[in-house]
Amino acid sequence: IIAHSKGGLDSRAAITRQGMAPYVASLTAVTTPHRGCIFAEYLLEKIPAAARQKIADTYNAALKRLGDERPDFLAAVTDLTASACEKRNAVTPDAPGVFYQSVMSYCRRAQHGKFPLNMTYPIVKHFDGLNDGLVAVDSARWGERFTLLEPKGKRGISHGDVVDLNRENIPGFDVREFYVSLAADLKRRGF
């Protein structure tokens, strides 16, 4: 499995708690917040309930337009807090026989991420340090192997860039070649 963001958390849960370990050789988690987002916890505590709901309604409406039949933005954000991830990690140990690795990128500046990552980057940096606009590097470390994608030049590699969300050419980073290399490395390792 190669999973991005929350997909890495869901994949770990499926492998360990849903009996999928016999069917999975490896999990590569790309920009996954294994240890959660401290900034999410802080914002959920500080933003008044009415404002939180208004933000959630806006995101939920957008997600419905994209095809999600029952979006729940607040539940998703709450699920990504540091405390929620700590609880999840306690009941989701790595499965024996499954190779776990993680990959992370980072932005050099807020403007290197598209909205809303350009807005969240400085907040994440304040609470969690080096980040991709959403996930901190330290939160993404998981498994036997950790790879940090080092952006060349002044441009960083955002949370959306690693899945080509913005369809941009980034000097020194070819997203297609990244995944081809990732798959080739897994093949070399026997997965």
Kindly label every feature range from the protein language model:
Residues I1-C85, D132:
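Serine-dependent carboxylesterase/thioesterase catalytic core
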Residues A90-F191:
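C-terminal catalytic-base region of ester-bond hydrolases, centering on the histidine
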